[in-house]
Amino acid sequence: MKRLLFIYNPHAGKELLKPKLADVIDIFVKAGYEVVAYPTQAYRDAYKKIKKYDSSEYDLIVCSGGDGTLDEVVTGMMKRDRDKREPIGYIPTGTTNDFASSLHIPRGLLEAADNAVNGEVFACDAGRFNDDIFVYIAAFGLFTDVSYQTKQSMKNVLGHLAYVLEGAKRLFNIPSYKVKV
């Protein structure tokens, strides 16, 4: 029997996965997988889990969460030897899910779960900036840490607006520079 490691962030977005978790796992099982479910417990937890598992244990890795959870899984996978990288499926349950939208991954949890186990595998570009891996965006500037500094509790209540409010707090701290033209 094929084996699937399901890494998920139970607090992503507005905790959308929790009420449908059994249905998602059922889709995996019906697709012929023995499933090991791993709920993340802290920042970088998904990264650590992916880096240390034995590649002979799983045929497919599926992650569920926001762009941050996906980033941790991809980063962990890219740090593994090339011959020890399994395909990654993604079920977007974050606040904005920009990466999933750009790849036309279904927004519905059950549709995305089915897509993860029955969809077509395709290559996805990954970049490296110093020692950081990225698949969606690499940025610099004044507001780049907004998505990381926005509290999960605020995202759960306000959704995307939480990012806007966190960014607005930074407006008062933008340094000014004297320039001569």
Model-derived features with residue positions:
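ATP/NTP phosphate-donor binding region
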Residues: M1-S64, T75
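Short beta->alpha linker loops
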Residues: Q41-R44, G65-G68, G94, G141
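A residue-level signal for conserved active-site and pocket-lining positions in enzyme catalytic cores
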Residues: N9, D67, V146
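Short, glycine/acidic-enriched loop or turn micro-motifs at the edges of active sites
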Residues: A12, L70, T95
